[in-house]
Amino acid sequence: MAEACRVRRMKLGSQGLEVSAQGLGCMALSARYGAPKPETDAIALLHHAINSGVTFFDTSDMYGPETNELLLGKALKDGVKEKVELATKFGFFIVEGEISEVRGDPEYVRAACEASLKRLDIACIDLYYQHRIDTRVPIEITMRELKKLVEEGKIKYIGLSEASASTIRRAHAVHPITAVQIEWSLWSRDAEEDIIPICRELGIGIVAYSPLGRGFLAAGPKLAENLENDDFRKTLPRFQQENVDHNKILFEKVSAMAEKKGCTPAQLALAWVHHQGDDVCPIPGTTKIENLNQNIRALSVKLTPEEISELDSLAKPESVKGERYMASMSTFKNSNTPPLSSWKAT
């Protein structure tokens, strides 16, 4: 059985950022996975996370949009902010509550940062990610503005999310990248080919989002069957019924292995991510304190090399049917930017 354990600390990247070895993805408290949770319940969960040793919180200006940052601003008042490492993101330009485009131009980078600081009610963001890459703007241009924000004391560390290996390398040459956020789990392993190696070559921390396959590795096909109509996952290829029928086989195999191991499927899947290296920090999200407690206990699940190998063999690319996102969504696979020489500021 997975035991209660203390959440260890880890160095994320090479610039000095220290975080809890498991973070908390905050998106579902406000958006995308059904109706927003009551504010008092959400704040109680955030405070419980801190008291349990999970202090690395992940949000974005597009969660809500904006309401998730406002929630965290309220939850972290009265000195609570000093106990956490707070990451937020920019990049999705929102018009009337809907994503209009991805932007990485200097004017927008600065405006987005200042708006996030105001909503979060803080003077400096610990880790500021470009949420998605603007493929019209050379990454060097975006990074130069982020570097200025570091120099001005508005952000401490810079991160990228869903960026290609070449984009990461070019960005890192302008200013050190502290962390790259990428989907990484037993059912999303395509980052292992190029993204993980470039991060390790450059000393960049790896933040694994959706380490439980957006909940599928915790609840299996019944999750897909019971999604609310306004749940973002209903639109994702992997949650369509024809793909769920295939993907449930992976869940069943993980469940059987977890039963033998004396832990839950979610804990086994999360433990696999934790075992990928000391430079990896998964950020599972949840809206329930009990699930948070269960996720923390995954840190106590020790996997042998043979068990890791068995999980690797279960989670081959052919084990999962359906793309991670709709074709229109920006990911690291379509995130290369024009050469710097092409840029003409307007």
Swiss-Prot record:
Q: Which residues form a coiled coil?
A: none
The entry's NADP(+)-binding residues are S210, P211, L212, G213, R214, G215, F216, L217, A218, A219, G220
EC numbers for this chain: 1.1.1.-
Q: Which InterPro entries match?
A: AKR (IPR020471), Aldo-Keto_reductase (IPR050791), NADP_OxRdtase_dom (IPR023210), NADP_OxRdtase_dom_sf (IPR036812)
**Which Pfam families does the record cross-reference, listed alphabetically?**
Aldo_ket_red
UniProt keyword Repressor present: no
The record's GO molecular-function terms, alphabetically, read:
oxidoreductase activity
Catalytic residue positions:
Y63 (proton donor)
Which positions are annotated as binding substrate? H131
Name the enzyme group at the top EC level: oxidoreductase
Keywords annotated in UniProt: NADP, Oxidoreductase
Question: Is NADP among the key words of this record?
Answer: yes
Q: Which family does it belong to?
A: Belongs to the aldo/keto reductase family. Aldo/keto reductase 13 subfamily.
Task: Supply the name of the protein.
Answer: Probable aldo-keto reductase 2
* Organism expressing this protein natively: Arabidopsis thaliana
